Amino acid sequence: MKQNKRLMVMAGGTGGHVFPGLAVAKQLQEQGWEIRWLGTADRMEADLVPKHGIEIDFIKVKGLRGQGVKRLLAAPFQIINAIMQARAHMKRWQPDAVLGMGGYVSGPGGIAAWLSGIPVVLHEQNAVAGLTNQWLSKIAKKVFQAFPGAFPSAAVVGNPVREDVTQLDEPAQRMQEREGPIRILVMGGSQGARILNQTLPAVMANLGQDYCIRHQAGKGAAQEVQAAYQANNVANAEVTEFIDDVAQAYAWADLLVCRSGALTVSEVSAAGVGAIFIPFMHKDRQQALNADHLVECGAAKMIEQPDLTVESLTQQIQQLDRQALLSMAQKARSAAKLDADKVVAQAIVALTEKR
């Protein structure tokens, strides 16, 4: 017999889906809720979620974009099978609500919850809603969005961001007395970004000793990127595959050069760091739209990928002295929505109290 309320989180594929889900889960765990995850066995959630003390169930589901004719013809059967798998997990565990945070798993999981009479809560992290969330929004009891425009009438709450990021000191406390080389942090998301790996070593060669850099290269790319810095005679570069303590990295940085995935944009704002965004090219300009509000308020700069060259990025960085970077950081922090995890958690609690 159940003692506590239960939430099943549906999120997978990338850190942009998984980390916000973990932030909401933590809020509810602190209120005595039991949390279980629905994911896929071959994506990052399979390794990451159990490290946070949360048990995970798996279903077999893959994306359909870019697939051949045979895969597309088989897709309806695979989706039905995934829905049945998800429904079986829910029948066994009996959650009081499910939270869809995106990734391939959310579609079958959301439909399974709806068929089982379990309320669905959605959170869209990007400025352009994904196809799965567009469908699920029609059956969800509550829909949230991080940025305006994803849905016409959903509440804008920001993205749930990890507590260690939201609790960083204000930019002035961190940056006011800094001396020495300007600190550049490069992050291409949890998967890395090849164009940043290719461009930054030559940029650092142009910038010289007045700058130092920490570079997250992505899985399997650190050795190649380190060699590129060495080939450009850049001594003050630290290269890793993945940065484990992201909050500490934000606190260290004067400037971030990065993609503008939804979670990255929200973390940059919550941490209070000036940024130069290089959006991933996508037909709906999703990443560019994610970053627009920070660019418009003076907290960030943006270079669209077709315009990115060693020269254009070098020039943009050289225009930003420490005072300008502090101003950008303060504007970023002022634009942050720091309570998205609490707002979503409160909505889930309120929804289940009505049942």
From Swiss-Prot:
It comes from the Bacteria. Disulfide bonds: none annotated. It catalyses: di-trans,octa-cis-undecaprenyl diphospho-N-acetyl-alpha-D-muramoyl-L-alanyl-D-glutamyl-meso-2,6-diaminopimeloyl-D-alanyl-D-alanine + UDP-N-acetyl-alpha-D-glucosamine = di-trans,octa-cis-undecaprenyl diphospho-[N-acetyl-alpha-D-glucosaminyl-(1->4)]-N-acetyl-alpha-D-muramoyl-L-alanyl-D-glutamyl-meso-2,6-diaminopimeloyl-D-alanyl-D-alanine + UDP + H(+). It is an enzyme of class 2 (transferase). Pfam families: Glyco_tran_28_C, Glyco_transf_28. It is a peripheral membrane protein. NCBIfam families: murG. PANTHER family: GLYCOSYLTRANSFERASE, UDP-N-ACETYLGLUCOSAMINE--N-ACETYLMURAMYL-(PENTAPEPTIDE) PYROPHOSPHORYL-UNDECAPRENOL N-ACETYLGLUCOSAMINE TRANSFERASE 1. This is UDP-N-acetylglucosamine--N-acetylmuramyl-(pentapeptide) pyrophosphoryl-undecaprenol N-acetylglucosamine transferase. It comes from Vibrio parahaemolyticus serotype O3:K6 (strain RIMD 2210633).
